[in-house]
Design a protein with these regions (language model features):
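A conserved mid-protein helix/loop that constitutes part of the nucleotide-sugar donor-binding site
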Residues: 8-13, 188, 192, 197-214
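Short donor-sugar binding/catalytic loops of nucleotide-sugar-dependent glycosyltransferases
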Residues: 1-3, 193-197, 212, 228-231
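Nucleotide-sugar donor phosphate/pyrophosphate-binding loop at the beta->alpha transition
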Residues: 56-61, 98-100, 105-124, 136-144, ...
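A short, active-site helix/loop in glycosyltransferases that binds the activated sugar's phosphate group
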Residues: 124-154, 159-165
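Short His-centered aromatic/hydrophobic patch
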Residues: 79-85, 103
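N-terminal strand-loop element at the rim of the active site
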Residues: 1-5, 10-56, 139, 144-151, ...
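A short helix/loop element that forms part of the nucleotide-sugar donor recognition site in Leloir-type
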Residues: 165-183, 239
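Glycosyltransferase donor-sugar binding loop
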Residues: 27-33, 159, 193, 222-237
Length: 239
C-alpha cells in the first residue's frame, strides 16, 4: 500500500519523475494514503491486491501483471516489497522483461522459510540497496543469490528539494501546525519524525529528552514525535 513510509514515498517520487524524463510510468498498488496525491495525467494507476501474502492472490497478481506488461509493452518492472516482488518475479520470467528490486530494510528471518521468502528481493536483475548498511546486510545474509550476472549497487534515499525547501515555508502554516500540536510558539522545538515502530528509535528519543531536561529543563523546549502508528496501538500507547 502507498502509505507514508520511505519505500512508499520513494515509489511515489520515482513514478512522477519518470514521465518528466520521457518514460511512461505505471504504478500498481492496492491503495493507501498517497493515492490522493498521484497526478493521473503523469502516472497510470492500476489497483491490484498486491499487498496480500495469500499465495492464491499472489498468483492472481502474477497473471494480471503478465497481461499488464504485454498489453502496455512495459520494459522494466520495479518491486519494493516482498509479496508483490514474488508476483513480479514470475511475471517478468514469463514475459522476459527486466526486473529491479529495492531492498529497503533488514527483513527478519527466524527460520529458513522466512529467509527464502525474503530472498525474492535479491532475485532480480538489478538489486538496489538503500544504504551501505543494507548493502552489507545483503552480502552477509543472502550471498548465494548474488552472482556476476546481477547488478548490485547502493542508491541513497533522496528527497524532493523543491517540496522541502525551507524558504518556501509560510509563517501561517507554521503557526497552524504549532496550534494543532498545542506547543508554545516561543520555545525551541525538537522534532522526531518517523513511523511509530520500535526500531525507529522513539524510546531512545524520549531517553535523550530526559538528558536534555536535566541540562535545560522541560520549560525551555517542546518535543514532538510525528508519525503514523500504522495500527501499532500497543506501541503508540507505550510511547
Amino acid at each position: 500500500k502507498l502509505g507514508y513510509g520511505g519505500a512508499e514515498t520513494g515509489c511515489y517520487d520515482l513514478a512522477h519523475y519518470l514521465p518528466e524524463n520521457n518514460c511512461i510510468s505505471y504504478l500498481v498498488t492496492s491503495g493507501g494514503q498517497l493515492l490522493k496525491f498521484i497526478d493521473k495525467k503523469k502516472v497510470k494507476l492500476i489497483k491490484l491486491p498486491v499487498h496480500s501474502k495469500n499465495p492464491v492472490l499472489m498468483l492472481f497478481n502474477s497473471i494480471a501483471l503478465i497481461f499488464i506488461i504485454l498489453l502496455n509493452n512495459i520494459s522494466i518492472v520495479h518491486a519494493r516489497s516482498r509479496a508483490p516482488a514474488w508476483s513480479c518475479l514470475l511475471a517478468t520470467i514469463i514475459t522476459r522483461r527486466k526486473f529491479v528490486t529495492t531492498f529497503h530494510g533488514t527483513y527478519n528471518f527466524k527460520n529458513p522459510f522466512k529467509k527464502f521468502y525474503n530472498s525474492v528481493m535479491v532475485r532480480s536483475d538489478l538489486i538496489i540497496a538503500g544504504s551501505n548498511f543494507i548493502f552489507s546486510h545483503i552480502n552477509k545474509n543472502y550471498p548465494k543469490y548474488l552472482d556476476l550476472k546481477k547488478k548490485f549497487l547502493v542508491i541513497f534515499r533522496g528527497i524532493n528539494v523543491d517540496y522541502f525547501d525551507p524558504s518556501t515555508t509560510l509563517d501561517n502554516e507554521e503557526d497552524r501546525l504549532k496550534s494543532d500540536w498545542e506547543v508554545n510558539k516561543n520555545k525551541k522545538m525538537i522534532l522526531m519524525p518517523g513511523r511509530l515502530t520500535a526500531w525507529k528509535g522513539q524510546e531512545t528519543f524520549i531517553e535523550a529528552l530526559n538528558l536534555v531536561n536535566k541540562e535545560l529543563g522541560y520549560e525551555s523546549f517542546n518535543a514532538v514525535i510525528l508519525g503514523s502508528d500504522q495500527g501499532r496501538d500497543i506501541y503508540s500507547k507505550k510511547i
